Amino acid sequence: MRLRSLLYLALLSAVPCFAQSTPYTDLVTLFNQWRAFEHPLVHDGVPDYSAKAMAAQAAELPKWQKRLAAINTTGWTIQQLNDLKLVHAEMNGLDFNLRVLKPWARDPAFYVNVLPARSDVPSREGPILHPYTELYKFKFPLSAADQKTLTASMTAIPAILTEARENLKDSNARDLWVYGEQELRNQSQTLADLDANKLTVSTLEGSQIADIKAADPALHAAIINARKATDDFVAWLEQLAPTKTGPSGVGKDNYTWYQQNVHFIPWTWDEEVTLLHRELERAQSSLRLEEQRNRNLPQLEPAANAEAFDKLTNTHLDKFVDFLVQQQILPDKPYLKAALEPQSGHFVPEDQRIFFTRVTHREPMLLYSHDYHWIDLARMRDEPNPSPIRRVISLSNIWDNRAEGFATAFEELLMHAGLYDDNPRAKELVWIMLANRAARGLASLYVQANEMNLEQAAKLHSQWTPRSWARLDKLTGFEQLLYLRQPGYGTSYITGKLLFDRLMTESSRQDEIAGQSFVLRDFMDQFNDEGMIPIPLMETELISKEAREP
């Protein structure tokens, strides 16, 4: 890692000097200042998302955009130019939030700010207020300093939710309002479990009980008050829900602008519909062909009890990591198994299973493949990117097509690489997983276009997932709400996968032009070294013009 950093700095110093060129370090300085501006003003732990404050931020944003545009990039490397594009995309993201999305004024779930579990992706999915409380970052039992910090955070929640009522009073986004209530109920339950010493918090390293038995009475009182304020807020949402009748999606044109100018997706809303239909059809037809091939084999039965599940996950974790290393897909790193092991899950009775546990109780390597997320997080922790801009997680979930798209692509990649050659029935699960992602992404597109509501989207999502494994349950509802709250997230699993397929195709073409063989391990090393940036930016850095698709 030290060598990578030194090489990166050497690359910076090797840039030719031009009289008009702006030093790259000026971009880094601007980036750090921009991040301070992007966050709201905070008074006594309460962020100011009032209409007046947001209007003031909107008035200042053009000045930041002008400062960025004034940077002279003559002589910059492609990596430095892409760092600038990332900063530009963040500014476009704030512009979109201020003009269109306005989560602080439309979306009640925006005000959920107590998080018990670390997300498996670089930052929290969807828009969220700042600051928020990451319970999993505390070490329990709490130190005196952490008790003080957590007490202050809990104490701020009633005032935050009081401001939320004022900010949301003109919202008419029905689905955001009605379905967002559940996210606040979840926060209430989190606070109740925390106060009762029953809350499990989870991180990359594993889980622990949030033990506050010995905490000061002031912390318990603050938690109780925060929960009451949350319950009162939910009651207020329920009371007004029947009056909410308006659309919640951003519309086709706004969706396309956001995807192209914030997430670097090259397609329009209509083109994404076509692409997701194609992946849904490919996944469904491939599943039926795999079932035909396996028709004389026994069905893949789920683990029947906790002992069987634990044995299955443990043995298949070792098999999975060995496959990655022995088949020369990834280098042997200490964090490979360490990142995945805490995410193995636990046995779930059949009548309580959701889509993903229906898969993992049959073949856990399917989710280990998608859990490349956790390998990403471990790599980011242990091998930080040499770029000071890429080292910081991009705003607006700009990383989604890299994180979710590649995790989805990795499932099929490993199948084709031979992971399930000794268990053909598991290949059926790969196609079921892909069909699920395509169906739910397609549904999310229709919701953003205001051609479906969330209830209709959940039905499409459920009906087009094979074997009725995605039922109209809490998971389906949660996913569709997230994809409504964060435009493009629901499609990123497929669009990112397609972009990865293109990158791999072009990389192999580039090797052919050079008279070399394509080596998957080398390609994966290059891909991972790029950092958590959108795949189209990687393409500009890794692929020569003559090797790109026409």
Regions found by a protein language model. Give the residues of each.
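Positively charged n-region of N-terminal signal peptides that target proteins for export
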Residues: 1-5
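Bacterial N-terminal signal peptides
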Residues: 6-16
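N-terminal maturation segment of proteins
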Residues: 20-550
